[in-house]
Swiss-Prot record:
Gene3D superfamilies: 4'-phosphopantetheinyl transferase domain
Protein name as it appears in the record: Holo-[acyl-carrier-protein] synthase
Gene designation per UniProt: acpS
Signal peptide positions on this chain: none
Organism this protein belongs to: Renibacterium salmoninarum (strain ATCC 33209 / DSM 20767 / JCM 11484 / NBRC 15589 / NCIMB 2235)
Keywords annotated in UniProt: Cytoplasm, Fatty acid biosynthesis, Fatty acid metabolism, Lipid biosynthesis, Lipid metabolism, Magnesium, Metal-binding, Transferase
InterPro entries assigned to the protein according to its UniProt record, in alphabetical order: 4-PPantetheinyl_Trfase_dom, 4-PPantetheinyl_Trfase_dom_sf, ACPS, Ppantetheine-prot_Trfase_dom
Family indicated by similarity: Belongs to the P-Pant transferase superfamily. AcpS family.
Domain of life: Bacteria
Cofactors, names only: Mg(2+)
Compartment(s) of residence: Cytoplasm
NCBIfam families xrefs: pantethn_trn, PRK00070.3-2
Length: 115
């Protein structure tokens, strides 16, 4: 059963400028394994994290590093711990579905939280 869905779109150039203007933003938003990725990939991962938050009802107090985007043979995966994992567990989320895409300077992500 679908518990929640979320979608987000990020302008890659605007995201790049924000990362450049805001010291520490990269470290605040991303886990170490994500930080070395190019800006387009970071923008897609940020969109995915926003989509996860929306699928969970945008819980207050969500720590950005408690959700990260991994990769396996089937594509991108949603990984959670601490604050995000606790909210997901309380809502009965057992499985995440994630699709990310880039086109024309835009990164987008769509998430389904499933029981």
């Amino acid at each position: 059963m679908i518990i929640g869905i979320g979608i987000d779109v990020v302008d890659v150039e605007r995201f790049r400028r924000q990362l450049e203007r805001t010291p520490g933003l990269l470290d605040r938003l991303f886990v170490p394994a994500e930080r070395s990725l190019n800006t387009r990939s970071l923008a897609a991962r940020f969109a995915a994290k926003e989509a996860v938050a929306k699928a969970l009802g945008a819980p207050a107090g969500m720590n950005w590093q408690d959700c990260w985007i991994g990769l396996d043979v089937n594509g991108p995966t949603v990984q959670t711990k601490n604050t995000v994992a606790a909210v997901a567990e309380a809502q009965g989320v057992k499985r995440w579905h994630l699709s990310m895409s880039h086109d024309g300077g835009i990164s987008t992500a769509f998430v389904i939280a499933e029981s």
